[in-house]
Amino acid sequence: MAKKVVVIGAGVSGLISLKCCVDEGLEPTCFERTEDIGGLWRFKENVEDGRASIYRSVITNTSKEMSCFSDFPMPEDFPNFLHNSKLLEYFRIFAKKFDLLKYIQFQTTVISVKKRPDFASSGQWEVYTQSNGKEQRTVFDAVMVCSGHHIQPHLPLKSFPGIERFRGQYFHSREYKHPVGFEGKRILVVGIGNSAADIASELSKTAAQVFVSTRHGSWVMSRISEDGYPWDMVFHTRFSSMLRNVLPRTVVKWMMEQQMNRWFNHENYGLVPQNKYLMKEPVLNDDLPSRLLYGAIKVKTRVKELTETAVVFEDGTVEEDVDIIVFATGYTFSFSFLEDSLVKVEDNRVSLYKAMFPPHLEKPTLACIGLIQPLGSIFPTVELQARWATRVFKGLCSLPSETTMMADIVERNEKRVNLFGKSQSQILQTNYVDYLDELALEIGAKPDFVSLFFKDPKLAVKLYFGPCNSYQYRLVGPGQWEGARNAILTQKQRILKPLKTRTLQSSDSAPVSFLLKILGLLAVVLAFFFQLQGF
């Protein structure tokens, strides 16, 4: 008899969890409190309590080839970075392809999840839900928590003396939808994350003046990298990940600084991070530097206090006649339907084995999917989490002892603090490629590069020096996909396809460029040789 699994939430984590359950022969039921799928990525004009909220102009920060599910590439004509509506379209295509909607009960809220009295032996759960005013209790063999962590706004008003007397408008960034109504205003955006940079850049096109207040600064990257390819297809390779792991910290820091300053000098723009040794997530924004050059945005230090109409900053400067303050200060999270004894959240910290499993449960039948913030795409990350969780539920994978899991949690937290710092915004941060490989190893889906080099050297080179995308984890192990190799070898054409909208005559510029590079290299070698000969 198939084990029954409850999936809480029908966002990206919930959808892929449903598919993984079906792939493993489990019987899933998904409870979604709203009327549709998509979670965070489904834009709505109004903010709704208990639901993630985005602004109309949001586009992905990770490219389509790095963000698709491992056995379902995005259509080749999709743009490389997707508007939220386009990403939602992909989710709909995905859900239809694998017939997932039949497992979802919409407008159904999970009230509580409790252990059954015989949990120590059965591992079962009682799930209480509410729909159309009626409550219902259902027993499940396992639970997948996919409710997200971008719902409860973090609004630290106590850190802003004088906010109670400020006459202007202030709100959290989750309430921002579009720039209409902000024309001609003087606006302060607090924070320097992706949302802060997006909102500040968008508002600066019609506002009288926009200020951005940041405590620590941030690296800012373009989505466009070398030769015009998406940034993450160049940044996230196994080779570059290996270098960041084995080289001395000072060398990695220097390399990172050089790479980040290649676009523009962050110190000149007032954005250089306070602690450059930390591998904090960079801001992805193609507009911010130009808006700073135009003077439409001005970078300020931390807010010291507010008056009725002005903002006083820590460096002593004052900006008068501020109309609006947007707090892009992140989110907190909790699980109101879970008892603290199951998953306890303290100061936005939670103790989960590999960011998924509560270590103290007698039976490993509850997993949190998506409670992580990788330095890369979240979509392949949650997919591997779901693949592992469903195999644990099925008994095909096992977890170590509670002592071992707790030791791993402590070690992982120490590494996180060492790499990313103690800031609240970095609490869920993790290295991208390392974490993917860690999960893949648990289910036997990590490629063996040594054997692959002898069997298929062309593919091995692509895997090691090319983008580390999700297709790699369908080459071996459970859930192999026969199209994985071809998807890896043809990703370049899917990147270029949406850009080929103008027919061009063939050009010899590429061969000439290549020849010039060869001649230049030859000239350097000859110059070095002649220098040795004393010419």
From Swiss-Prot:
The modification N-acetylalanine is found at A2. GO terms for biological process: energy homeostasis; NADP metabolic process; negative regulation of fatty acid oxidation; organic acid metabolic process; oxygen metabolic process; toxin metabolic process; xenobiotic metabolic process. There is a cross-link at K492 (Glycyl lysine isopeptide (Lys-Gly) (interchain with G-Cter in SUMO)). It is found in: Microsome membrane; Endoplasmic reticulum membrane. It is an enzyme of class 1 (oxidoreductase). Gene3D superfamilies: FAD/NAD(P)-binding domain (3.50.50.60). GO terms for molecular function: flavin adenine dinucleotide binding; monooxygenase activity; N,N-dimethylaniline monooxygenase activity; NADP binding. InterPro entries: FAD/NAD-bd_sf, Flavin_mOase, Flavin_mOase-like, Flavin_mOase_2, FMO-like. NADP(+) binds at T60, N61, S195, A196, A197, D198. FAD binds at G9, A10, G11, V12, S13, E32, L40, W41, N61, T62. One of its GO terms (cellular component) is endoplasmic reticulum membrane. It holds the Pfam family FMO-like. Signal peptide: none annotated. The chain crosses the membrane at residues 510-530. Optimum pH is 10.5. PANTHER family: DIMETHYLANILINE MONOOXYGENASE. Catalyzes the oxidative metabolism of numerous xenobiotics, including mainly therapeutic drugs and insecticides that contain a soft nucleophile, most commonly nitrogen and sulfur and participates to their bioactivation. Catalyzes the S-oxygenation of the prodrug ethionamide (ETA) to the S-oxide (ETASO), the first step in its bioactivation following by the second oxygenation to the sulfinic acid but to a lesser extend. This is Dimethylaniline monooxygenase [N-oxide-forming] 2. It comes from Mus musculus (Mouse). The gene is Fmo2.
